[in-house]
């Protein structure tokens, strides 16, 4: 007894020592981190004190000593960065000495990304280790064991080495996966090898069901009508009516869950995988034997492996079935036309079929083999009903069977034959533990609520009613598949529409998926760039798809036709945009002025909300505690008003009360997310106001144009001239001072004129001396006045004469002086016999510079001529 009691004490002491060691390591790590942060801050301060490029750095760098020191420092820093990154398993791409700052920045950012990625990988590995979701340990073959046993220190050192070199280990695993993928290459499509036909046309889907097993008799004399008020079924077309016709619709609607499935029963433990027999079904005889076996059991688990990339409609590659005692794997390729005989056990309402995530499996069985399911239990639906944190099959198996599933072949190409042992084991594990998991889920549902189990069966039956529909080509389907990063013009839209149609036609003809023929990003790149030749097409498609290379001429023809389309920038209509958003499930809520005013996130007028803190608290102290509705004017926010933790007494009252559905809170939170803020309301109001003002302005302009009151702003030479009114000085307030002739104070004033005399009187004359010529005359009149002043100048134009003989006081303008007759007999005719004066001697005040130049040239010519004649003047 003393020895047994000492063992727990030793274990407790050892655990305390481990905790103390972990605490010390944590404190040491924190000190190191703080030291690194302090050193980093000092490094930043020191680096800020260095000369800056573009300021003093060039001046300092002109000295050889500084230049040499900087190069050596750069080499030392590069070596340190390389050493640090290598020590943590992320070698850095160190730049050469003298590289630009941009190059250094790029290398440092790349190193930071690698370090962050490695840290995330290690963190994920630690989280999986806590949840026991680690990679399965391979089975070791028993051999001669070494005599020397490794100590705990050596084991911990080996683990640290593995942690430090995790990148190398992952690279090795990737290399092994590439080798396995090379061995699993499918040289020929199963559709050709096994002569599997598929209908890829636009025709509606027709069921492959040949014999309807377990059919119920239809009651005669009962007619069901499901029409609208007008008596017509306008909402169902002939095509949808054919496709939506489920062969077992009556059997599923009248299905009642057997009483044994609604009661508690013993959970039958599964047998070990290696102790369970496995049968491969690849012939018709084996398939018939399997059908008899399934008809004799009460329940079995089913799972499918599917391939979508190299088939237009898809291809079921493997069917896994597990009973309580045996596992079966069906290879459907050799017996494709005979798998339909499984419809007998699958449609039997007395046999339970257990699936996990059966929404797609049910449709694939209908499409390929004509097999329909009745009496289904979906473990995924049950996990959702029990509100598990995860809903995957791996989590379900880990929770109940304590087995970690290896999901490395989840996305493998299941068309490859022969199947590898690892792939066979992966397929077995998907159904081997499913029946035991069903037992555990059933008991938990019954323990939670008896209605929950019935609800799971009801929701599973809704999945069975689903009918497979063939994909119908939509000319505008690319709007839902492709996320655009730019606005399409008419040419790009033409190219994208026709490439999308061409891809669908080729995929249907060759039985390939549209994405295999031409991926979305390549189709978008071709439509955006519109290459002119084959080389441009190949540049947009990298790596080059097989059918693009084979049918380059068709693609080039579409692009050439797109280039001939008239170039216009068009956008999506509101209907097309809404249809695309609805197809993606991102339908935006329309918000008008009234709803934006009524719905607001921060309207707390009906609640006891603390506006100073600015928060709404939801009590999460107890997951099962119901939230009580408050009768504060029936406000939507009333359920969110409890900001303090309730007391124990309050919690007891709530627990004893009627439990409300927690979905109400989620629904209200979703409603709150749709509400708009006051600033968003203000923005919407401003946009509406701007639109209204713009419409009013356009309407006013339209009315003015119709009425002809809009003043003319553009003129041409055909328009009549406009008399410019003189500008008056605002300081001249007395109109009498502007009169040309002042009034005589001695003259008696005239009596007031009559209205007739006032209307016939002449307009008042103003004194023009109070205005400048620029204010009274136009530009042309000013030019004429300057020309006249230049012609009628009073300065003498003859050198030597003091003034003109004419007296300016006696000179009158042509307008004022009367025209007199000239008597030529009295004129002095000797005036015409005088010699002509020199034109250069005339005085022209506007051309004096030309006169001086000519005079200078003339004097220089006279000097040269005198020098040639030898006349030299000497000074006495």
UniProtKB/Swiss-Prot annotation:
EC numbers, comma separated: 3.1.13.-
Disruption phenotype: RNAi-mediated knockdown results in retarded growth, low penetrance of embryonic lethality, accumulation of apoptotic DNA in 1.5-fold stage embryos and delayed appearance of embryonic cell corpses during development.
Region Disordered, annotated ranges: 1-22, 690-876
Binding site for Mg(2+) 1: 303, 361
Binding sites annotated in the UniProt record for Mg(2+) 2: 303, 305, 430
Tissue-by-tissue expression: Ubiquitously expressed.
UniProt keyword terms in alphabetical order: Apoptosis, Exonuclease, Exosome, Hydrolase, Nuclease, Nucleus, rRNA processing
Pfam family, one: PMC2NT
Compartments where found: Nucleus; Nucleus, Nucleolus; Nucleus, Nucleoplasm
Function (record text): Catalytic component of the RNA exosome complex which has 3'->5' exoribonuclease activity and participates in a multitude of cellular RNA processing and degradation events. Involved in apoptotic DNA degradation. Involved in regulation of antisense ribosomal siRNA production. Involved in response to cold-warm shock.
Protein name: Exosome complex component 10 homolog
């Amino acid at each position: 007894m003393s020895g047994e009691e000492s063992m727990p004490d030793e274990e407790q002491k050892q655990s305390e020592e481990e905790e103390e060691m972990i605490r010390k390591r944590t404190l040491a790590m924190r000190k190191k981190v703080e030291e690194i942060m302090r050193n980093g801050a000092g490094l930043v301060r020191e680096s800020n004190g260095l000369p800056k490029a573009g300021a003093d750095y060039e001046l300092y760098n002109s000295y050889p000593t500084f230049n040499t020191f900087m190069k050596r420092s750069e080499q030392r820093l590069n070596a340190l960065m390389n050493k640090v990154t290598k020590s943590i398993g992320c070698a850095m791409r160190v730049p050469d000495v003298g590289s630009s700052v941009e190059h250094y920045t790029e290398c440092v950012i790349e190193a930071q990304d690698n370090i962050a990625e490695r840290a995330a990988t290690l963190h994920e590995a630690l989280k999986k280790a806590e949840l026991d979701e680690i990679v399965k340990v391979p089975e070791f073959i028993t051999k001669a064991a070494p005599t020397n046993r490794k100590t705990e220190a050596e084991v911990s050192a080996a683990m640290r080495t593995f942690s430090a070199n995790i990148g190398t280990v992952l690279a090795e695993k990737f290399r092994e996966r590439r080798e396995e993928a090379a061995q699993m290459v499918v040289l020929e499509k199963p559709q050709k090898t096994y002569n599997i036909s598929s209908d890829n046309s636009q025709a509606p889907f027709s069921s492959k069901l040949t014999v309807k097993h377990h059919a119920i008799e239809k009651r005669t004399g009962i007619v069901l009508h499901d029409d609208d008020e007008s008596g017509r079924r306008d909402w169902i077309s002939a095509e949808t009516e054919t496709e939506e016709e489920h062969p077992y619709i009556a059997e599923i609607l009248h299905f009642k869950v057997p009483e044994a499935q609604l009661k508690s029963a013993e959970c039958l433990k599964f047998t070990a995988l290696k102790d369970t027999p496995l049968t491969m079904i690849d012939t018709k005889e084996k398939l018939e034997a399997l059908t008899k076996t399934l008809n004799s059991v009460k329940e079995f688990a089913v799972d499918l492996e599917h391939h979508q990339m190299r088939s237009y409609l898809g291809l079921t590659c493997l069917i896994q079935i597990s009973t309580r005692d045996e596992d079966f794997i069906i290879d459907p390729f050799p017996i494709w036309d005979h798998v339909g005989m499984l419809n007998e056990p699958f449609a039997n309402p007395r046999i339970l079929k257990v699936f996990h995530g059966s929404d797609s499996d049910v449709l694939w069985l209908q499409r390929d083999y004509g097999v329909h399911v009745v009496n289904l239990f979906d473990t995924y639906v049950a996990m959702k009903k029990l509100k598990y944190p995860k809903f995957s099959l791996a989590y379900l198996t880990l929770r109940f069977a304590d087995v970690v599933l290896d999901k490395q072949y989840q996305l493998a190409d299941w068309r490859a034959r022969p199947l590898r042992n690892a792939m066979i084991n992966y397929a077995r594990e998907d159904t081997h533990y499913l029946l035991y998991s069903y037992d555990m889920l059933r008991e938990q549902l019954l323990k939670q609520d008896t209605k929950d189990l019935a609800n799971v069966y009801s929701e599973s039956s809704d999945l069975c009613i689903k009918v497979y529909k063939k994909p119908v080509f939509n000319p505008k389907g690319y709007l839902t598949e492709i996320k655009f990063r730019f606005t399409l013009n008419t040419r790009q839209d033409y190219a994208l529409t026709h490439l999308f149609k061409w891809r669908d036609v080729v995929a249907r003809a060759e039985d390939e998926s549209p994405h295999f023929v031409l991926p979305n990003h390549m189709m978008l790149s071709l439509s955006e760039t519109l290459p002119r030749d084959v080389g441009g097409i190949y540049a947009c498609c990298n790596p080059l798809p097989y059918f693009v290379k084979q049918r380059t001429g068709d693609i080039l023809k579409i692009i050439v036709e797109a280039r001939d389309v008239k170039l216009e920038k068009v956008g999506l209509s509101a209907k097309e945009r809404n249809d695309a958003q609805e197809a993606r499930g991102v339908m935006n809520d329309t918000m008008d002025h009234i709803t934006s005013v009524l719905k607001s996130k921060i309207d707390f007028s009906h609640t006891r909300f603390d506006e100073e803190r600015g928060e709404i608290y939801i009590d999460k102290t107890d997951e099962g505690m119901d939230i009580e509705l408050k009768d504060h004017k029936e406000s939507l926010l009333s359920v969110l008003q409890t900001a303090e933790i309730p007391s124990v007494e309050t919690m007891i009252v709530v627990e004893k009360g009627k439990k409300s559905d927690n979905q109400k809170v989620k629904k209200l939170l979703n409603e709150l997310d749709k509400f708009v803020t006051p600033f968003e309301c203000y923005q919407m109001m401003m946009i509406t106001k701007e639109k209204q003002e713009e419409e009013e302005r356009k309407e006013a302009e339209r009315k003015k144009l119709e009425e002809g009151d809009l003043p003319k702003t553009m003129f041409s030479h055909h328009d009549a001239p406009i008399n410019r009114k003189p500008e008056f000085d605002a300081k001249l307030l007395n109109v009498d001072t502007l009169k040309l002739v002042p009034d005589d104070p001695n003259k008696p004033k005239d009596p007031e004129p009559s209205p007739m005399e006032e209307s016939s009187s002449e307009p008042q004359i103003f004194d023009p001396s109070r205005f400048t010529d620029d204010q009274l005359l136009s530009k042309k009149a000013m030019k004429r006045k300057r020309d006249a002043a230049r012609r009628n100048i009073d300065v003498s134009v003859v050198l030597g004469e003091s003034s003109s003989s004419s007296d300016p006081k006696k000179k009158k303008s042509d307008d004022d002086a009367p025209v007199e007759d000239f008597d030529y007999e009295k004129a002095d005719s000797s005036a015409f016999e005088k010699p002509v004066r020199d034109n250069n001697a005339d005085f022209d005040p506007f051309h004096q510079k030309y006169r001086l130049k000519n005079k200078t040239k003339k004097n220089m010519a006279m000097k040269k001529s005198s020098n040639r004649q030898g006349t030299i003047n000497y000074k006495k």
